[in-house]
Amino acid sequence: MTSLLLFGAGGLFDFDATLPLMALQVVLLTFILNALFFRPVGRVVEEREVYVTTSRAEAKQKLAEAEKLELELKEQLKSARIAAQQLIQEAEKDSEQLYREALAIANADANAAREKARREIDAQRDSALSQLKGDAEKLGDLIVNRLLAAK
């Protein structure tokens, strides 16, 4: 019974014009699908693949450029920091030098004023001593004269 269903008229393996017609339909449908669907889809897939490949290449190139710029900027920042440190050190040296010069000038002025005051005091002392000597001599002479006059 199964052999009748398989090989009989209208069975699965009926070799009349149906099988070649079906084969022709499959081949024709394959060509139509290939022309209308598979080729355009294949082209879109290839275009997308090319786009992705070029995008990745551009991204890698931009990443390399960004890394290069980052290194350059780090070097510039490093040199700027070094230059700033040098400027700060020079400014500190200059301010220290100015401080020392101002201190030396102030000390010199103070020493000069002290020396001038000492000289004035010495002059006034000498003047006072000489005046006292003169007054003492006058007073001594006056006492001697009064003592002699009193005798």
From Swiss-Prot:
Record HAMAP family: ATP_synth_b_bprime (MF_01398), ATP_synth_bprime (MF_01399)
CDD domains, per database record: ATP-synt_Fo_b
Protein name: ATP synthase subunit b'
Membrane topology: Single-pass membrane protein
Purpose: F(1)F(0) ATP synthase produces ATP from ADP in the presence of a proton or sodium gradient. F-type ATPases consist of two structural domains, F(1) containing the extramembraneous catalytic core and F(0) containing the membrane proton channel, linked together by a central stalk and a peripheral stalk. During catalysis, ATP synthesis in the catalytic domain of F(1) is coupled via a rotary mechanism of the central stalk subunits to proton translocation. Component of the F(0) channel, it forms part of the peripheral stalk, linking F(1) to F(0). The b'-subunit is a diverged and duplicated form of b found in plants and photosynthetic bacteria.
Gene Ontology MF terms in the entry: proton-transporting ATP synthase activity, rotational mechanism; proton-transporting ATPase activity, rotational mechanism
Subunit comment: F-type ATPases have 2 components, F(1) - the catalytic core - and F(0) - the membrane proton channel. F(1) has five subunits: alpha(3), beta(3), gamma(1), delta(1), epsilon(1). F(0) has four main subunits: a(1), b(1), b'(1) and c(10-14). The alpha and beta chains form an alternating ring which encloses part of the gamma chain. F(1) is attached to F(0) by a central stalk formed by the gamma and epsilon chains, while a peripheral stalk is formed by the delta, b and b' chains.
Highest taxon of source: Bacteria
Major place of residence: membrane
Cellular component, GO, one term: plasma membrane-derived thylakoid membrane
